């Protein structure tokens, strides 16, 4: 996986074992770790964070609060609570490959720790897809998308840890999606996060994402990127330098603008500005 150059760093290669780790600029996310471990066994320890673990290959055996468990590939998400002792070891001959997102300890209430200890493996395809999408957004440094994905992951995990209660069909306040769109349109480059927009219209981030997507067929973070690209194109055609356009329209830097520009238009900002492909 190509990791964002400004965030990821390879912190260890030894005897076929590799580890990448970085701290993204996303509220609620403490650290991201990717590991390819062939024969590494790690001793009993604790974290002050919640662990969202995706196994992509192999099998991990571990003890959590002195009870044996396994983290399985492809189908499940393992959620380990903070302050609870656990270890880990390869349970397959070729080792394992995993992706881990560590969430701040206050992302979930302490009352859910016991449920996570009792059943850390969550077999939920939707949660697996959302967690993987969160990891990809963090890899690429897409903070807006990561914020949105995180909101959905947190909501889904909490639903499982509270016993999967029947979801009440609550009508959102009238016009949530429309009011959110007005806020995004008013200052696309100045929006700092989806959570702020959700708070402004009086709903949770996950609620806003669902309502907006249902209304417009696109999640709010993707809509916002599109609006920022519209502004960037206008400024580029007016002759502004790409590096200045990037920061003026809400992108972190020119590389961030270029990546989204390529996704939409299959060319770079500089070539677009020059009228070449």
Where are these regions (language model features)?
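Short, leucine-enriched amphipathic alpha-helices that occur as contiguous helical runs
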Residues: 173-181, 225-229
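Actinobacteria-biased recognition of intrinsically disordered, low-complexity terminal regions
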Residues: 1-25, 274-277
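N-terminal regulatory/effector-sensing and dimerization cores
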Residues: 18-116
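Amphipathic alpha-helical segments enriched in hydrophobic/aromatic residues interleaved with Lys/Arg
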Residues: 110-169
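Basic/polar phosphate-binding segments, predominantly the helix-turn-helix DNA-binding elements
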Residues: 185, 190-230, 237, 246-275
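Short, Lys/Arg-enriched N-terminal segment that forms or immediately precedes the first helix
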Residues: 37-38, 161-169, 209-216
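Regular secondary-structure segments
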Residues: 56, 128-139, 181, 185-188, ...
């Amino acid at each position: 996986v190509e990791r964002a150059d400004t965030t990821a760093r390879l912190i260890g290669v030894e005897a076929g074992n590799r580890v990448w780790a970085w701290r993204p600029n996303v509220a609620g996310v403490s650290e991201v770790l990717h590991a390819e471990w062939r024969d590494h066994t790690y001793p009993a320890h604790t974290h002050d964070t919640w662990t969202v673990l995706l196994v992509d290959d192999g099998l991990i055996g571990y003890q959590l609060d002195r009870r044996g468990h396994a983290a399985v590939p492809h189908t499940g998400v393992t959620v380990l609570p903070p302050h609870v002792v656990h270890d880990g070891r390869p349970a397959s001959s070729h080792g394992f490959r995993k992706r881990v997102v560590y969430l701040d300890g206050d992302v979930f209430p302490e009352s859910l720790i016991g449920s996570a200890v009792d059943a850390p493996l969550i077999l939920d395809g939707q949660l697996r897809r959302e967690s993987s999408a969160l990891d990809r957004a963090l890899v690429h440094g897409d903070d807006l998308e990561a914020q949105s994905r995180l909101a959905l992951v947190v909501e889904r995990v909490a639903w499982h840890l509270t016993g999967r209660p029947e979801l009440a069909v609550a009508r959102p306040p009238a016009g949530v999606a429309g009011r959110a769109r007005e806020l995004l349109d008013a200052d696309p480059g100045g929006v700092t996060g989806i959570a702020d927009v959700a708070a402004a219209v009086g709903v949770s981030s996950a609620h806003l994402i669902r309502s907006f997507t249902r209304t417009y067929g696109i999640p709010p973070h993707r809509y916002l990127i599109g609006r920022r690209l519209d502004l960037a194109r206008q400024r580029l055609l007016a002759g502004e330098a790409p590096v200045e356009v990037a920061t003026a329209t809400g992108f972190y830097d020119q590389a961030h603008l270029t990546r989204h520009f390529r996704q939409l238009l299959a060319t770079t900002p500089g070539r677009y500005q020059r009228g070449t492909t």
